[in-house]
Every structure is written in C-alpha cells, then in structure tokens.
Amino acid sequence: MPDPLSFRIKKQFDRYLHDPIMAIIAIPLFLIFKLLPYKFSSYFCGTLMYLIAPLTSYNKRVKKHLKIVFPKKSLEEINKLTSQHWFMLGQTIGEMPHINNLIKSGNLETEGLDRIKKGPAILVGAHMGNWEFLLRVGDLAGRRAGYVFRPINNWILNKIQIYRNKDANADFYRKGRIAAIGMASKLKNGEIVGLTGDQLLREGIMVPFFGIETPTPQAAAIMAIKWNVPIYMVRVERYKYSKFFEMDLSKMVFLKFTKKHIHLSAE
C-alpha cells in the first residue's frame, strides 16, 4: 500500500527543510561544546537544558512518568526530580564531544571488564549516567564489539553521530533486520554485542512495567537462549565529586529454555 500523500509531504519537508535547519543549529553548538573544557561544557549545557526544557511539552511527559514510578512523592519532590533529570540530560549532551578525553584523563572508573575479555557475550545497557560510555566498553576490554543503534530522527545529525563514533573500535548495526544478522554473526564468531534495553518501542513482548503493560525488547534474551551466551548488564553511574563516572558489568546471567519455563542463573 503506497504511503499517504500527507506522509510523503512530511517526509520531504523533514529531509529538505526541518532536518537541515536543526542541523544548522546543532552543529555550531556541538563545535562550541567541543572547544570548551569538559567540566564547563557539561555544566553550561546542563544549565541550558535546565532552563529551557521545562518550557516544552516534554516536561509534562517527564512528570507523568515520574509520578508512575514514585506515586508517594509530593508534587514538590516530583518537580525537583524533573529539574534534575533535565540538568543531567544537558550534562550528557555537553559531554558528548569529550568522551574520549574523559576516558583518557581517568574520569571513568571501570569494574568487571575482565569478564568479557574472552568468549561471546551480550551487553545490555540503559540511558543512565552518560550512556555514550556504553559504546566504549568493548574497546576498554580490548575487544571489537558490535552495537545496535536507533537512528536519530534527523538524517544529517545521524551521519554525524556515526562519524563521531568511528574511533570507538566497534561495528554499528542499524536497528532492524541488519542488526539481527550482524549480532548473530558476531556471537557465532565468539565476539560481543551490545544494545540498550530501555528505548521506546512499538514492538516486542508486553511486560508489566510499574503496573503498565509495556512493549519490551526481547532480542538479548532470544539470542542468549539460542546460542547459550551470557548476558551482562552494564551500568554507568555519575558522581558529583572525585571520580566523574563509574562503569561496571554485572555478574553474568544465563538463560536456559525448557518446554515450559525459562530458567535464569547468575555466576
């Protein structure tokens, strides 16, 4: 069935007008952040997001979700968490041009990398702390990993994002069939793959999440069962003082499938 006319018009509008305009705004800002010291860039961008984001419609969405997660918190506490959320998101954006420098200067402490130095493994992370470090976990362990990514909704910025991560010593697979083939090939060859498990999806299995049926990605579990490969949860935590970030890998999780049950064990 052909796309509706309105969809085709919007697609052309985004490609030739909306996306270039947004790129013209974003690229100079990115270059400015890159020229600034990383601490100043982090704080400056965090402050910008802290001031601007509450004026957008996304602010109501954040508060709505926080109320679901923390139903007993007061409105004042929810507002405080919302402000902290926007500030940290701004910090992450301001730190993006400095990821390699943050690692080289010792601002990232790691724990558990020895667990993935040999053999196949599936790494599952989330958009926490500064998720840009997730793309470096394989390289930090001396391995060339394969990562699944969801393209940015801007074809120009998406190309820049891919180019920016060219030094991550990794292969990148666009979410979909290509990613499934790429991950399967990596695991069969005894290598490691990584993906984030908290992206908004319209597909997947429905799982209760804070009492709400939510589409949930299942690729990691399916691959782990099919090839008997361990899953490691990768967590990045942000600190205010001394060290800047810590990234650690959990104990390995094995999933074993029988006709009636899926058994989970940790080592």
Stretches found by the model and what they are:
Residues 2-125, 130, 159-162, 169, ...:
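Membrane-anchoring hydrophobic helices of lipid-metabolizing enzymes
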